[in-house]
Amino acid sequence: MALGSNTKFYETPNHPFQGERIADEANLIGRYGLKNKEELWRAQSELRGYRREARKLLGSAGEHETESEEFLARLKRYGILNEQDQLDDVLSLDVTDVLERRLQTVVYRKGYANTPEQARQFIVHGHIVLDDARVTRPGMTVETAVESSVGFDEHSSLSDELHPERAEAQE
């Protein structure tokens, strides 16, 4: 690996043993089917970056108007913010807002899998397509425009409606 290339895309907690934080992390890992705490910390770092950018843009109100519009448009495109939300609303985001936009969670919420863990397995094994392209990264952030194109690969055995591993229709 080249010198100076950043291989760590998250920050670990400052204090290693805080019971409440550890319990909250375990709850989120279980609810979203994350592989390990590193994935959760990556989402927290992503959220931290969004907040940092919002504070920077709020501090220089008026000077960087196009940058703030582009920043808001990006967050709205990913579905992290609603269409009516403003720059102030970025500061009130929670890590669950970021985790809800992961491909793994979208596949589970759309009813293609019974559990988030099963959704992760379907993605990693190449059964899920996004815009007719096979995707094998469960942590990928899904844009709202392409969310409707999530489905099973036509060459996958799971594309059969009667496959035993297919999820029941969730209401």
From Swiss-Prot:
Query: What cellular component GO annotations does this protein have?
Result: small ribosomal subunit
Report the family membership.
Belongs to the universal ribosomal protein uS4 family.
Pfam families reported for this sequence? S4
Assembly information from the UniProt record = Part of the 30S ribosomal subunit. Contacts protein S5. The interaction surface between S4 and S5 is involved in control of translational fidelity.
Biological process GO terms, please? ribosomal small subunit biogenesis; translation
InterPro entries documented for this protein: Ribosomal_uS4, Ribosomal_uS4_arc, Ribosomal_uS4_CS, Ribosomal_uS4_euk/arc, Ribosomal_uS4_N, S4_RNA-bd, S4_RNA-bd_sf
Q: Where is this region: Disordered?
A: 148-171
Q: What does this protein do?
A: One of the primary rRNA binding proteins, it binds directly to 16S rRNA where it nucleates assembly of the body of the 30S subunit. With S5 and S12 plays an important role in translational accuracy.
Which UniProt key words apply to this protein? Ribonucleoprotein, Ribosomal protein, RNA-binding, rRNA-binding
Ranges annotated as biased composition (Basic and acidic residues): 152-171
Positions of the S4 RNA-binding domain: 101-165
User: One GO MF term, please?
Assistant: structural constituent of ribosome
Highest rank taxon of the organism: Archaea
SUPFAM superfamilies to which the protein is assigned, alphabetical: Alpha-L RNA-binding motif (SSF55174)
Identify this protein by name: Small ribosomal subunit protein uS4
